[in-house]
């Protein structure tokens, strides 16, 4: 701005000089040309600062305090978060003309483009160079101005265009990843079908535990070891994220060992995982809560070691089992924080009501009152043991049936987590 001031002063002085020159008729034309030439140069130069030519505005609006922050805290936040950020990148991808060039694509063009934005080198939140600026973090970019939707689970989250990130953008605090042993049992690949696994780019580390570690490091860089850690939601840092790990491979023992030693250990070392304190017999909540589901091991010596003091012999258990809600007993209250079952499994406990429920689902797209009551009792039993509840496998088509069943699960049955594939739709309920 001082250069603009100097130039304006120069123009005024030039104008006065030219006025004096103009008093002489012989120099009148020269004076006019001089003024015009100077004004043309100033206008062209000033345009680069006031956007006359369409360039970015370069006026300085910073205050004294922020100017001392320095370039170490610069960041590339677009100012769009949540669903708006998703729509921005989807629209940007739709403008792409060349769809044949696959060079450099890893997960997908869409995913890769979003990740490049989230992890840009000038994000300013990395602690690698000693900087600490949570406002420029991935959490800030994804979830600022996003309200947490506490009663929703992102079903088959790994199938989404943006595994993990899409759920966070919608404020969903529960996700899941199906894992398979690959590469001679040295890695866990993520996917629903073993035939379509991508060992290189779709692993538990690349899609989930790696991004989570980065995000949590960025927002906790100002905290001490004993401080309670901030989570992945900007407006609700105390909210834990449920991370379901669905065991798919037959060798559950090896899957568990690899999960603990390779994928969860960095998160544990930083104090980011919820754990069960075996001495105090209580749950200590942290930013991420890992829940084992599917074909997980049930042998206590596998889960907690030979001495039954936790996998790392620290009297802490860093994973919880997804308790079977349809065949629940009290011992799950010490090893679980959630209970799940399919709708059919729960209806199977309703004596002669199962067939009637099936007919009602086909005709009316909803459960009859008797079936709702029966399922609700099983949910209440789990809740009485201190467990959150989730029902999976409910019909999702036609649309009218899905809406009715959502309403019954939330308001009539009292489920804690609604299992859904439609994240954007469910946030508007």
Swiss-Prot record:
Claim: Signal is one of the keywords in the record: yes
Keywords, alphabetical: Signal
Highest taxon above the source species: Eukaryota
Record family assignment: Belongs to the AIM6 family.
GO biological process: lipid metabolic process
Keyword Signal part of the UniProt annotation: yes
Protein name, per record: Altered inheritance of mitochondria protein 6
One example GO MF annotation: phosphoric diester hydrolase activity
Coiled-coil region(s): none
Gene source species: Lachancea thermotolerans (strain ATCC 56472 / CBS 6340 / NRRL Y-8284)
């Amino acid at each position: 701005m001082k250069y603009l001031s100097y130039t304006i002063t120069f123009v005024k002085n030039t104008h006065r000089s030219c006025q004096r020159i103009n008093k002489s008729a012989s120099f009148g034309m020269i004076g006019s040309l001089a003024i015009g030439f100077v004004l043309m140069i100033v206008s062209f130069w000033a345009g680069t600062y006031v956007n006359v030519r369409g360039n970015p505005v370069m006026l300085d609006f910073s205050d004294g305090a922020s100017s001392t922050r320095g370039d170490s805290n610069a960041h590339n936040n677009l100012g769009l978060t949540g669903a708006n950020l998703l729509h921005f990148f989807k629209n940007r991808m739709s403008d792409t003309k060349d769809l044949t060039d696959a060079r450099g694509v890893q997960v997908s063009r869409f995913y890769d483009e979003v990740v490049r934005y989230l992890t840009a080198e000038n994000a300013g939140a990395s602690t690698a160079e000693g900087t600490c600026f949570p406002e420029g973090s991935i959490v800030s970019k994804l979830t600022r101005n996003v309200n947490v939707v506490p009663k929703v689970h992102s079903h088959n989250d790994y199938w989404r265009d943006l595994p993990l990130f899409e759920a966070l953008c919608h404020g969903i605090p529960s996700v899941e990843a199906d894992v398979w042993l690959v590469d001679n049992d040295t890695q866990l690949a993520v996917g629903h079908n073993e035939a379509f696994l991508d060992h290189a780019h779709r692993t538990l580390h690349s899609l989930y535990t790696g991004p989570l570690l980065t995000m949590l490091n960025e927002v906790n860089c100002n905290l001490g070891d004993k401080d309670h850690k901030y989570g992945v939601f900007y407006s609700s840092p105390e909210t834990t994220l449920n991370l379901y790990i669905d065991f798919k491979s037959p060798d559950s023992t090896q899957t568990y060992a690899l999960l603990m030693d390779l994928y969860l250990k960095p998160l544990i070392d930083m104090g980011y995982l919820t754990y069960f304190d075996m001495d105090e017999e209580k749950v200590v909540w942290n930013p991420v809560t890992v829940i084992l589901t599917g074909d997980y091991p049930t042998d206590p010596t596998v889960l907690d070691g030979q001495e039954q003091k936790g996998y790392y012999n620290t009297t802490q258990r860093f994973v919880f089992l997804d308790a079977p809600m349809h065949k629940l007993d009290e011992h799950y209250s010490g090893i679980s924080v959630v209970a799940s079952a399919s709708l059919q499994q729960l209806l199977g406990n309703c004596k002669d009501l199962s067939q009637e429920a099936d007919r009602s689902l086909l005709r009316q797209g909803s459960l009859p009152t008797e079936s709702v009551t029966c399922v609700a009792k099983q949910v209440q039993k789990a809740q009485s043991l201190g467990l959150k509840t989730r029902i999976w496998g409910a019909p999702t088509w036609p649309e009218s049936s899905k809406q009715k069943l959502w309403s019954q699960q939330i308001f009539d049955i009292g489920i804690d987590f609604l299992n859904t594939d439609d994240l954007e739709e469910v946030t508007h309920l």
